[in-house]
Structure formats: C-alpha cells, structure tokens
C-alpha cells in the first residue's frame, strides 16, 4: 500500500508559500520522492528532463535564469511545464522570474517558495516524500515508545499485548499503534511504524472495549510514528522449555526488509511484563552505548575460573 501526496499537503507540512496555485494545481499528485534541479534544462538541454518530479530552483538556477533574455527565459520555462510536473519550488525566498509564473499559470502548475537554504529544503522534501510515498505493510502487534525506544510488542492473540501496553502508558510511556501497525522502510537500516488513521490513539482492552488513550491520558501519552528498534515477543510459559537466562541470544526478525533485534519473554502469573519490557528497553539502550551486562558477567566468570585454576 502506497499513500498519495498532494501539493497542498506538501505546502501544509513544510510551511511553503504559495506564489501561484489554484485548486486544481494544488491537488496535483506527487508520484515520486525524487527531486529535480533543472540546471541543464535552463541551457536548453531537455533530453533527460525528469518532468514528473518536483522542480527545485536554488540560487544557481535563479541567477542563471536572470541572465537570459526574457523571450528565451519564457520559452525555457514553458518547456519545463509538463502535464505531470507536480510543482516548482524556489528556495532562499528568492525573487521568482515573471516568466516562470506566466508559464506555470498557462499550464496549471503551482509555484511555491521557501525561505530556507536549498540544501536544507532538499533534505526536508526528500525526507517527507520518502516517508509518505514508501510502500507500507501491516504487522500485528502494539507499538509503544518506551524511554524513547520504539518497542513493538507481538505475540499470540490473547497473550496480553494491549493490557501490557496500557500498563506502560500508565507508567508514562507513549502509544503509537495498537493491534495493527503500518510499517515502512525509511532507509536500509530503519523501519518506521505508525497507526492506521482509523485506529489512531485507540487501544482495545478485552472486557472494557475501545479506549481513547489521548482522551484519557492526555496528548503526552501518544505519538504519531516511531522507529521500530526492538521487538518483544510474548509467549505462554512452558514448564519444560529452556529459556535464555543470560541474554546471550541475539535473535533478529525481519520487518519491512529491515532486521530488527527481538527478545522473547515468557508470560505466566506473577510476572509484571510491563516492568520487564521497561528493563529490556533500558538494557537494549545500554548495549547500543557499549555496555553489555552478559559480556561483563562472562568476563568476570572467566577471570574467576583462571584465578581458581592458578591456585
């Protein structure tokens, strides 16, 4: 599933100024996250013109255009306006050539402007569009922000995922999505999760029903999206099954083509799963900062064995 981005949504989310744009042009669809800077095209070379991309004008493009004759400038600007060109965006709050506005009006293409630098604007455009246009898949589970770490709680139906998430919310953590989490790959190492719009801020608790977390706990108890950094899989305790007691098993699970660390927590009466997840999140963060309690224990054990063997 891929979302659609309209020009007016880009304007609202990136606080862009609309220099020209009517209802039809602001409803044009952006189909790719790639951004084009039409430098060669201003010289008249259109062989490889990416007409279906947003066209970004920085100080180099504007300065070059200003040195052209008005008739030549208008001709080039008209050639830049294709049927599927989403919009023109000018950075640094630069003055926009009248010929660009004229050509845009003739072809129903919006002209937008931003006060920020070209490189920064390019980064913001790419980041926003890559996130919105990324292919999304859905996974079953509950995504919670635990101490700033995106923890995806998974497990069999009825194991207590939502109840555990509710306990975490009561302890000051934040809900991103319950039951169904829409995930997408942001880059090679990053997967992001968010709720479907219809389930935003909602959590289902058996015996109570649907709860609006933001209404009950406030805006600080929810957030719109989060990187999935750790997967916690809840499973029913089995008496004869051997569980990892040292934390030396580095299991991974693939989500949206990204490998994410996973830990499995056996659930049984008397275990406070919410607190265990809190500790798991803190321990995971400690590992990413270079401290591994398991390795420390193994080193101590090795030293003790060596000392005893030398006596």
From Swiss-Prot:
<dbReference type="InterPro" id="IPR003755">
    <property type="entry name" value="HPr(Ser)_kin/Pase"/>
</dbReference>
<feature type="region of interest" description="Important for the catalytic mechanism of dephosphorylation">
    <location>
        <begin position="266"/>
        <end position="271"/>
    </location>
</feature>
<feature type="active site">
    <location>
        <position position="161"/>
    </location>
</feature>
<feature type="active site">
    <location>
        <position position="245"/>
    </location>
</feature>
<comment type="function">
    <text>Catalyzes the ATP- as well as the pyrophosphate-dependent phosphorylation of a specific serine residue in HPr, a phosphocarrier protein of the phosphoenolpyruvate-dependent sugar phosphotransferase system (PTS). HprK/P also catalyzes the pyrophosphate-producing, inorganic phosphate-dependent dephosphorylation (phosphorolysis) of seryl-phosphorylated HPr (P-Ser-HPr).</text>
</comment>
<feature type="active site" description="Proton acceptor; for phosphorylation activity. Proton donor; for dephosphorylation activity">
    <location>
        <position position="179"/>
    </location>
</feature>
<keyword id="KW-0067">ATP-binding</keyword>
<comment type="similarity">
    <text>Belongs to the HPrK/P family.</text>
</comment>
<dbReference type="GO" id="GO:0000155">
    <property type="term" value="F:phosphorelay sensor kinase activity"/>
</dbReference>
<keyword id="KW-0723">Serine/threonine-protein kinase</keyword>
<keyword id="KW-0479">Metal-binding</keyword>
<dbReference type="Pfam" id="PF02603">
    <property type="entry name" value="Hpr_kinase_N"/>
</dbReference>
<dbReference type="Pfam" id="PF07475">
    <property type="entry name" value="Hpr_kinase_C"/>
</dbReference>
<feature type="binding site">
    <location>
        <begin position="155"/>
        <end position="162"/>
    </location>
    <ligand>
        <name>ATP</name>
    </ligand>
</feature>
<feature type="active site">
    <location>
        <position position="140"/>
    </location>
</feature>
<keyword id="KW-0547">Nucleotide-binding</keyword>
<comment type="subunit">
    <text>Homohexamer.</text>
</comment>
<dbReference type="GO" id="GO:0004674">
    <property type="term" value="F:protein serine/threonine kinase activity"/>
</dbReference>
<dbReference type="InterPro" id="IPR028979">
    <property type="entry name" value="Ser_kin/Pase_Hpr-like_N_sf"/>
</dbReference>
<feature type="binding site">
    <location>
        <position position="162"/>
    </location>
    <ligand>
        <name>Mg(2+)</name>
    </ligand>
</feature>
<keyword id="KW-0808">Transferase</keyword>
<keyword id="KW-0511">Multifunctional enzyme</keyword>
<feature type="region of interest" description="Important for the catalytic mechanism of both phosphorylation and dephosphorylation">
    <location>
        <begin position="203"/>
        <end position="212"/>
    </location>
</feature>
<dbReference type="GO" id="GO:0000287">
    <property type="term" value="F:magnesium ion binding"/>
</dbReference>
<dbReference type="InterPro" id="IPR027417">
    <property type="entry name" value="P-loop_NTPase"/>
</dbReference>
<dbReference type="InterPro" id="IPR011126">
    <property type="entry name" value="Hpr_kin/Pase_Hpr_N"/>
</dbReference>
<dbReference type="GO" id="GO:0004712">
    <property type="term" value="F:protein serine/threonine/tyrosine kinase activity"/>
</dbReference>
<keyword id="KW-0418">Kinase</keyword>
<dbReference type="GO" id="GO:0006109">
    <property type="term" value="P:regulation of carbohydrate metabolic process"/>
</dbReference>
<dbReference type="GO" id="GO:0005524">
    <property type="term" value="F:ATP binding"/>
</dbReference>
<dbReference type="InterPro" id="IPR011104">
    <property type="entry name" value="Hpr_kin/Pase_C"/>
</dbReference>
<keyword id="KW-0460">Magnesium</keyword>
<keyword id="KW-0119">Carbohydrate metabolism</keyword>
<protein>
    <recommendedName>
        <fullName>HPr kinase/phosphorylase</fullName>
        <ecNumber>2.7.11.-</ecNumber>
        <ecNumber>2.7.4.-</ecNumber>
    </recommendedName>
</protein>
<feature type="binding site">
    <location>
        <position position="204"/>
    </location>
    <ligand>
        <name>Mg(2+)</name>
    </ligand>
</feature>
């Amino acid at each position: 599933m891929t979302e659609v981005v309209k020009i007016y949504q880009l304007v609202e989310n990136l606080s862009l100024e609309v220099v020209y744009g009517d209802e039809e042009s602001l409803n044009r669809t952006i189909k790719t996250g790639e951004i084009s800077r039409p430098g060669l095209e201003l010289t008249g070379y259109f062989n490889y013109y990416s007409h279906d991309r947003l066209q970004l004008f920085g100080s180099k493009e504007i300065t070059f255009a200003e040195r052209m004759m008005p008739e030549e400038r208008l001709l080039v600007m008209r050639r830049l306006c294709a049927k599927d060109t989403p919009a023109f965006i000018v950075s640094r709050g630069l003055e926009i050539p009248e010929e660009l506005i004229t050509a845009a009006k003739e072809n129903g293409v919006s002209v937008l402007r931003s006060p920020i630098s070209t490189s920064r604007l390019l980064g913001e455009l790419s980041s926003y569009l890559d996130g919105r246009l990324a292919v999304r898949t859905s996974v079953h589970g509950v995504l919670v922000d635990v101490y700033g770490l995106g923890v995806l709680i998974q497990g069999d139906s009825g194991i207590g995922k939502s109840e555990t998430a509710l306990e975490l919310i009561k302890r000051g953590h934040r809900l991103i999505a319950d039951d169904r989490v829409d995930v997408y790959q942001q880059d090679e190492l990053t997967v992001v999760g968010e709720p479907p719009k219809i389930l935003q801020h909602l959590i289902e608790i058996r015996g109570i029903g649907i709860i609006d977390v933001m209404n009950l706990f406030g805006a600080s108890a929810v957030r719109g999206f989060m990187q999935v950094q750790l997967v916690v899989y809840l499973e029913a305790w089995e008496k004869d099954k051997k569980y990892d007691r040292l934390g030396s098993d580095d299991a991974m699970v693939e989500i949206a083509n990204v490998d994410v660390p996973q830990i499995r927590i056996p659930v049984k009466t008397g275990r406070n799963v919410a607190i265990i997840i809190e500790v798991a999140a803190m321990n995971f963060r400690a590992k990413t900062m270079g401290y591994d309690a398991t390795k420390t224990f193994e080193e101590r054990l090795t030293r003790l064995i060596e000392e005893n063997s030398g006596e």
